[in-house]
Regions:
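Mid-to-C-terminal secondary-structure elements
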Residues: 132-145, 158-254
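A short amphipathic helical element positioned immediately N-terminal to and/or at the very start
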Residues: 15-22
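Solvent-exposed, non-transmembrane alpha-helical starts
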Residues: 75-84, 121-126, 153-156, 210-220, ...
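Short, strongly hydrophobic transmembrane alpha-helices
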Residues: 24-53, 63
Length: 254
């Protein structure tokens, strides 16, 4: 009998709760929606926090990579570093440093690209990042096709990301050796470069896509790397009087 009474009491409680839900249906719906929005906002904030905190952790040597900054006499940081800084630091030969590298700010470029069918197609706003040859030692990009060693010895060498290579040439094709003709004059180009460009680059390697959460170009997708760029900032005559990129050091283990 006591069991039946407890069962009946529990049933009455459930009925009253159900009636209350029906009676205050609008308020309950608002409460449920509010709770759902709160959980969603918390989840988004947690994801963004983890995303930002994982910046640069995609790099093999992320714990040993140091971002080098310059400061004014008032201890205010400059925006970036000049392209000559990494060259000067290399000459000092710090025992604690394994390598220095310079990465120019990514900028959009326009190219006429030689396709597999020997045609030339125009591509605009391809985000190119000029780097020096030590970039591979510091950031260890995964080379999928071609050779970084060959690219480092080749003037005006282009290293495409996987997604751009697939977009232009398709899956399973080999774009190594294809030409890309610059279709504009850059601010750092020599005076002899026409306004319509004309400088020829060659594709020497394909690398895995660079993640968006890196110090190199936070939330900006990079389409290609440029090595030994005759039109770029590293060979620009006025490179010592301006900032235009980031300088990094790879510290020795320990």
């Amino acid at each position: 009998r006591s069991t039946l009474m407890r069962s009946s009491a529990a049933s009455d409680v459930y009925k009253r709760q159900f009636r209350n839900l029906l009676k205050y249906k609008a308020q309950n719906i608002i409460s449920i929606i509010g709770l759902s929005v709160g959980i969603l906002c918390f989840s988004i904030c947690l994801y963004c926090s983890r995303y930002i905190n994982s910046t640069d952790k995609c790099f093999t040597h992320w714990e040993r990579i140091a971002d080098i900054n310059l400061y004014t006499p008032a201890e205010e940081p400059y925006s970036g570093t000049p392209a000559t800084l990494f060259e000067s630091l290399r000459q000092l030969q710090f025992q604690e440093v394994e390598a220095f590298t310079f990465v120019a700010y990514p900028r959009p470029r326009s190219y006429n690209v030689e396709t597999i069918d020997k045609e030339e197609l125009p591509y605009e706003d391809l985000y190119a990042m000029e780097v020096d040859t030590a970039y591979h030692s510091v950031f260890t990009p995964e080379v999928l096709q071609g050779s970084w060693a060959v690219a480092s010895q080749t003037p005006n060498a282009v290293i495409l990301t996987r997604s751009l290579a697939h977009k232009i040439f398709g899956l399973g094709e080999n774009p190594i050796g294809k030409r890309m003709t610059l279709a504009q004059r850059l601010f750092s180009s020599p005076d002899t470069t026409p306004r319509t460009g004309g400088t020829i680059y060659t594709i020497q390697a394909i690398i895995e896509d660079i993640p968006l959460n890196t110090s190199l170009s936070f939330l900006q997708k990079i389409d290609m790397l440029i090595l030994n760029d005759s039109e770029g900032l590293i060979q620009f005559d006025g490179r010592d009087s301006m900032t235009g990129g980031l300088t990094f050091a790879l510290l020795r283990p320990g």
